Amino acid sequence: MQAYLPIERPQSFFTCASGGLGHSMPAAVGIALAKAGRAPLSGVPSTQRVIGLFGDGSAMYSFQALWTAADLGLPMTIVIVNNGGYAALSEFTAHFNIKQLIGTKLPGLDFVGLARAMGCTGARVERAPNLAAALREALESSRPFLLDVAVAPLG
């Protein structure tokens, strides 16, 4: 993903210092609102587009933040790296000697459908050769856009 979205200047990459489950989507909406200079409230349009990049598990903690993005017309693209589960949690299995994690798989979630229900546009990418064109469409959209990128499940 860094080949498609390089970090080239200060104030262009934000993250949290620890576990980020549930943090990313509302944080991206807040950053878009701040970068837009509160454009939806002032009526002044902004060309600064925010890109939120996070996993499908994290997205499920705070998906309703997309409604705020759509309602305020924020210039943003959400990229969900979709491996079908809470992969970050599965890394704890060896540390805590857990043989099987329960409730960490998220098969069949329709993130594009959820985004549309929240008032956003979206697309799903299932093959790497299609990523560049889909990302271009997402970045050129006049509305908040969710890009659901399927990747291989971990483990």
Question: Language-model features: where?
Answer:
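Thiamine diphosphate
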Residues: 3-155
